[in-house]
A protein has these predicted regions:
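C-terminal soluble interaction/assembly domains
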Residues: 71-72
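Active-site recognition of the HExxH zinc-binding catalytic motif
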Residues: 77-89
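Metalloprotease/metallohydrolase-associated module, dominated by Zn2+-dependent proteases
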Residues: 10-54, 60, 64, 105-165
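Sec-exported extracytoplasmic/periplasmic mature domains
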Residues: 88, 94-101, 105, 126, ...
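Bacterial Sec-dependent N-terminal signal peptides
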Residues: 1-11
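A mature extracytoplasmic/lumenal domain signature
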Residues: 64-66, 90-92
């Protein structure tokens, strides 16, 4: 029986794809004018796993929620910042895949081990998302924003071998 960690992807969700970037049409959530942000991007990282015939099977999903994402200020610059959030989620999907490929699971402990790995990865993802917003001042600091987008691009490239999760 498969077990899900996090939310299962559905019609509301767009899976991360290298050749598809977000557009403002993807942002269908109700904007929150009191949020103090120009936009909000809701990303999800999930893993479905099972242990069958002595082998661990898993499916990792990195997705964007249309209904939970919104934009007040809709321009290409803000959209680029928001795409950065989605790309950071993809970095951690690849890191999760890398850890799962390298880890030696056993039938007795695999559920506990997988939960720990998943929780560690998601905590690191949230920390990086927060640091991205903090250091770029939510994209206001254009120099830092450009640096972060380059850093994200480099890390995605470095983890390219783990994109086939």
């Amino acid at each position: 029986m498969p077990v899900w960690l996090m939310a299962q992807a559905n019609a509301d969700h767009i899976r991360w794809q290298d050749r598809r970037t977000l557009t403002w049409a993807d942002y269908q959530g109700k904007a929150d004018p009191d949020a103090g942000a120009a936009a909000s991007t809701a990303t999800y990282l999930s893993v479905e796993y099972n242990f069958k015939d002595g082998k661990l099977g898993y499916v990792i999903t990195c997705s964007f929620s249309r209904s939970k994402s919104w934009g007040l200020t809709k321009n290409d610059y803000i959209l680029s910042h928001e795409q950065g959030h989605f790309d950071i989620a993809e970095i951690f999907a690849r890191r999760l895949y890398k850890k799962l490929k390298a880890y030696e699971f056993d039938k007795k402990n695999y559920q506990t081990d997988l939960r720990r790995i998943y929780e560690d990865i998601t905590a690191e993802k949230e920390e990086m998302q927060n640091r991205y917003d903090r250091e770029t001042n939510h994209s206001i600091n254009k120099e830092k924003q450009a640096g972060w987008l380059e850093k994200i691009k480099i890390e995605l490239k470095e983890l390219e071998a783990f994109a086939g999760y």
